[in-house]
Amino acid sequence: MIEADRLISAGATIAEDVADRAIRPKLLAEYVGQPQVRSQMEIFIQAAKLRGDALDHLLIFGPPGLGKTTLANIVANEMGVNLRTTSGPVLEKAGDLAAMLTNLEPHDVLFIDEIHRLSPVVEEVLYPAMEDYQLDIMIGEGPAARSIKIDLPPFTLIGATTRAGSLTSPLRDRFGIVQRLEFYQVPDLQHIVGRSARHMGLEMSDDGALEVARRARGTPRIANRLLRRVRDFAEVKHDGAISAEIAAQALDMLNVDAEGFDYMDRKLLLAVIDKFFGGPVGLDNLAAAIGEERETIEDVLEPYLIQQGFLQRTPRGRMATVRAWNHFGITPPEMP
């Protein structure tokens, strides 16, 4: 199973990236959710503008699909500067990064997605650029090689990552601002779904937006993807208007249940409950039981189930929680 094949995957496709650009908020005033992040960034941005400085370097981390790229765009818009975008895997050589840095205007924002995937060679070039606004470049090879320094304009580096723990300490320590994005609350997702529906010219009730939000796994990217599929269903099977009933019918047809679980989530939980009496069960046995790789279970299926309290990791293996039993209407066994 490939994560990108799942309707409730938090990863983005190229087509979705293009479609989502039109409905992304442009300013902090339009930004929904993440209240602590929003209030802090308002102060940091206003203070930088009052001083006439570039904003401090910013690290944004958290699960995929929560709006790290959106926040980077908002920062650039609020500061009134250009945004240059790249990603860690694209910057293969030091010269790739040097080319981007030397083309920045004063106070511009350089956004590096997946910054945890920077190569050590590129990362070494980034240190003096972040700290001293200087670029150290080696000219020539062998005994004739020499280092030259190029002054850079003050700029803001925004790094985004889903794996903050994978960053090296020297890189992490050079960010003056660090923001963690959390999963969204249902009321905030409902607001996002309603806003997206209006941008798409859809007729959607508040209850319809709520139904989509409940099944979106706390993730705006998933909410917008589900909204597009509900729109398709409403246009073909009904008159295009989206009520709670129509949204529920569409999502049930797509095998996304009330908790936002898809077929694979339910298959894993039911395997633990039915085949292993609720667990504990070892990872290898569980992988064999559902026909998946253990890495798929660890990296793709488990995290959300554990976070939502449906699955436990114990020293003896995986166990279904009482909440998992109740989700399927099965009476949990008596605790000894």
From Swiss-Prot:
<dbReference type="GO" id="GO:0006281">
    <property type="term" value="P:DNA repair"/>
</dbReference>
<feature type="binding site">
    <location>
        <position position="69"/>
    </location>
    <ligand>
        <name>ATP</name>
    </ligand>
</feature>
<feature type="region of interest" description="Small ATPAse domain (RuvB-S)">
    <location>
        <begin position="185"/>
        <end position="255"/>
    </location>
</feature>
<keyword id="KW-0238">DNA-binding</keyword>
<comment type="function">
    <text>The RuvA-RuvB-RuvC complex processes Holliday junction (HJ) DNA during genetic recombination and DNA repair, while the RuvA-RuvB complex plays an important role in the rescue of blocked DNA replication forks via replication fork reversal (RFR). RuvA specifically binds to HJ cruciform DNA, conferring on it an open structure. The RuvB hexamer acts as an ATP-dependent pump, pulling dsDNA into and through the RuvAB complex. RuvB forms 2 homohexamers on either side of HJ DNA bound by 1 or 2 RuvA tetramers; 4 subunits per hexamer contact DNA at a time.</text>
</comment>
<dbReference type="InterPro" id="IPR041445">
    <property type="entry name" value="AAA_lid_4"/>
</dbReference>
<keyword id="KW-0234">DNA repair</keyword>
<dbReference type="GO" id="GO:0009378">
    <property type="term" value="F:four-way junction helicase activity"/>
</dbReference>
<feature type="binding site">
    <location>
        <position position="68"/>
    </location>
    <ligand>
        <name>ATP</name>
    </ligand>
</feature>
<feature type="region of interest" description="Large ATPase domain (RuvB-L)">
    <location>
        <begin position="4"/>
        <end position="184"/>
    </location>
</feature>
<feature type="binding site">
    <location>
        <position position="24"/>
    </location>
    <ligand>
        <name>ATP</name>
    </ligand>
</feature>
<dbReference type="InterPro" id="IPR008824">
    <property type="entry name" value="RuvB-like_N"/>
</dbReference>
<feature type="binding site">
    <location>
        <position position="69"/>
    </location>
    <ligand>
        <name>Mg(2+)</name>
    </ligand>
</feature>
<dbReference type="GO" id="GO:0048476">
    <property type="term" value="C:Holliday junction resolvase complex"/>
</dbReference>
<dbReference type="InterPro" id="IPR036388">
    <property type="entry name" value="WH-like_DNA-bd_sf"/>
</dbReference>
<protein>
    <recommendedName>
        <fullName>Holliday junction branch migration complex subunit RuvB</fullName>
        <ecNumber>3.6.4.-</ecNumber>
    </recommendedName>
</protein>
<keyword id="KW-0227">DNA damage</keyword>
<keyword id="KW-0547">Nucleotide-binding</keyword>
<feature type="binding site">
    <location>
        <position position="294"/>
    </location>
    <ligand>
        <name>DNA</name>
    </ligand>
</feature>
<feature type="binding site">
    <location>
        <begin position="131"/>
        <end position="133"/>
    </location>
    <ligand>
        <name>ATP</name>
    </ligand>
</feature>
<dbReference type="InterPro" id="IPR036390">
    <property type="entry name" value="WH_DNA-bd_sf"/>
</dbReference>
<feature type="binding site">
    <location>
        <position position="70"/>
    </location>
    <ligand>
        <name>ATP</name>
    </ligand>
</feature>
<feature type="binding site">
    <location>
        <position position="65"/>
    </location>
    <ligand>
        <name>ATP</name>
    </ligand>
</feature>
<dbReference type="InterPro" id="IPR008823">
    <property type="entry name" value="RuvB_C"/>
</dbReference>
<dbReference type="Pfam" id="PF05496">
    <property type="entry name" value="RuvB_N"/>
</dbReference>
<keyword id="KW-0963">Cytoplasm</keyword>
<feature type="binding site">
    <location>
        <position position="318"/>
    </location>
    <ligand>
        <name>DNA</name>
    </ligand>
</feature>
<keyword id="KW-0378">Hydrolase</keyword>
<dbReference type="InterPro" id="IPR004605">
    <property type="entry name" value="DNA_helicase_Holl-junc_RuvB"/>
</dbReference>
<dbReference type="GO" id="GO:0005524">
    <property type="term" value="F:ATP binding"/>
</dbReference>
<keyword id="KW-0233">DNA recombination</keyword>
<feature type="binding site">
    <location>
        <position position="174"/>
    </location>
    <ligand>
        <name>ATP</name>
    </ligand>
</feature>
<comment type="subunit">
    <text>Homohexamer. Forms an RuvA(8)-RuvB(12)-Holliday junction (HJ) complex. HJ DNA is sandwiched between 2 RuvA tetramers; dsDNA enters through RuvA and exits via RuvB. An RuvB hexamer assembles on each DNA strand where it exits the tetramer. Each RuvB hexamer is contacted by two RuvA subunits (via domain III) on 2 adjacent RuvB subunits; this complex drives branch migration. In the full resolvosome a probable DNA-RuvA(4)-RuvB(12)-RuvC(2) complex forms which resolves the HJ.</text>
</comment>
<feature type="binding site">
    <location>
        <position position="184"/>
    </location>
    <ligand>
        <name>ATP</name>
    </ligand>
</feature>
<feature type="binding site">
    <location>
        <position position="313"/>
    </location>
    <ligand>
        <name>DNA</name>
    </ligand>
</feature>
<dbReference type="Pfam" id="PF17864">
    <property type="entry name" value="AAA_lid_4"/>
</dbReference>
<feature type="binding site">
    <location>
        <position position="23"/>
    </location>
    <ligand>
        <name>ATP</name>
    </ligand>
</feature>
<keyword id="KW-0067">ATP-binding</keyword>
<dbReference type="GO" id="GO:0006310">
    <property type="term" value="P:DNA recombination"/>
</dbReference>
<dbReference type="Pfam" id="PF05491">
    <property type="entry name" value="RuvB_C"/>
</dbReference>
<feature type="binding site">
    <location>
        <position position="221"/>
    </location>
    <ligand>
        <name>ATP</name>
    </ligand>
</feature>
<comment type="similarity">
    <text>Belongs to the RuvB family.</text>
</comment>
